[in-house]
Amino acid sequence: MLVTTTPIIEGKRIVKYYGIVSGETIIGANVFRDLFASIRDIVGGRSGAYEEVLRMAKDTALQEMQAQAAKLGANAVIGVDLDYETVGGSGSMLMVTANGTAVTIED
């Protein structure tokens, strides 16, 4: 499935719009605790472990969004937007959301 942040796909005609699709994932507080405990792997101001968890959360949200689009019969998602937001009473969890428009493009 083609996934893009742009509202069109150059050289392709959109033949059907299905509407908004989304995928979400939440990283719990225990993950943050584990990450901060391993803060020793920071190199140049970056934490490789933290970045890997964020990358996995993003990938999960995108996969859920694509699965929802596939169920509708779409073969692409356009206008994709990723959002990161803290949730929970003390902001102890991070939610990653992927949103876009499910479409069918010509082959």
From Swiss-Prot:
It comes from the Bacteria. Pfam families: YbjQ_1 (PF01906). Gene3D superfamilies: Hypothetical protein apc22750. Chain B (3.30.110.70). SUPFAM superfamilies: YbjQ-like. InterPro entries: UPF0145_dom_sf (IPR035439), UPF0145_YbjQ-like (IPR002765). HAMAP family: UPF0145. Belongs to the UPF0145 family. This is UPF0145 protein BT_3410. It comes from Bacteroides thetaiotaomicron (strain ATCC 29148 / DSM 2079 / JCM 5827 / CCUG 10774 / NCTC 10582 / VPI-5482 / E50). The lineage of its organism: Bacteria, Pseudomonadati, Bacteroidota, Bacteroidia, Bacteroidales.
